[in-house]
A protein has these predicted regions:
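Local cysteine-cluster metal-coordination motifs and their immediate loop/turn environment
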Residues: 61-79
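Short, flexible loop/turn motifs enriched in small residues
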Residues: 3-7
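Residue-level recognition of the N-termini of beta-strands and the immediately preceding loop/turn
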Residues: 8, 54-57, 115
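A short, polar/charged loop-to-alpha-helix boundary motif
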Residues: 28-43
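Zinc-dependent deaminase
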Residues: 1, 73-143
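Short beta-strand scaffold segments in enzyme catalytic cores
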Residues: 8-17
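Immediate flanking context of iron-sulfur cluster ligation sites
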Residues: 50-62
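Short beta->alpha transition motifs characteristic of CBS
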Residues: 20-27
């Protein structure tokens, strides 16, 4: 958040529980495609075998957008666990007076059929909600 990026973060974890990579949103760079889930998918494609990717889990603060879900599916990553849903994010943005995302939200399984997805996680979703409130208050005139 300190860099001006929306408060999203993800961790890529191997089947044995080893943290392989982590990243944060970088859309503040001016490139709206610099989503952390997309970056982790690219990292996984370059650094993991197909078997390792399939056995890995991505833990993320927010449900993948369609672009990131597609990247996840194309590289063959395994399970996704997300703290807050796209539906929750849309409600928070409305509550904060923010603009809706430019791309329609789709459930991850609509983009990547058959993938194992868990979320939202209620206890963590509240923490993500608080981060979005703090971000919006800091970087907008409306909070």
């Amino acid at each position: 958040m300190e860099a001006g990026d929306e408060p999203f973060g993800s961790v890529l974890v191997a089947a044995d529980g080893t943290v392989l990579a982590e990243d944060r949103n970088r859309v503040g760079s001016g490139d709206p495609t610099r989503h952390l889930e997309f970056e982790l998918a690219r990292w996984a494609a370059a650094n993991m075998t197909s078997e390792e990717r399939a056995a890995a889990t991505v833990y993320t603060s927010g449900e993948h957008c369609p672009m990131c879900a597609a990247a996840h599916g194309w590289v063959g990553l395994g399970r996704i666990v997300y703290a807050s849903s796209s539906e929750q994010l849309a409600a928070w943005l409305t509550e904060l007076g923010g603009a809706a995302p430019p791309v329609r939200a789709l459930r991850i399984q609509e983009v990547v059929p058959g993938i194992l997805v868990e979320g939202p996680v209620p206890a963590l979703a509240e923490q993500v909600h608080d981060l979005h409130h703090r971000f919006y208050r800091k970087y907008s005139n409306k909070g």
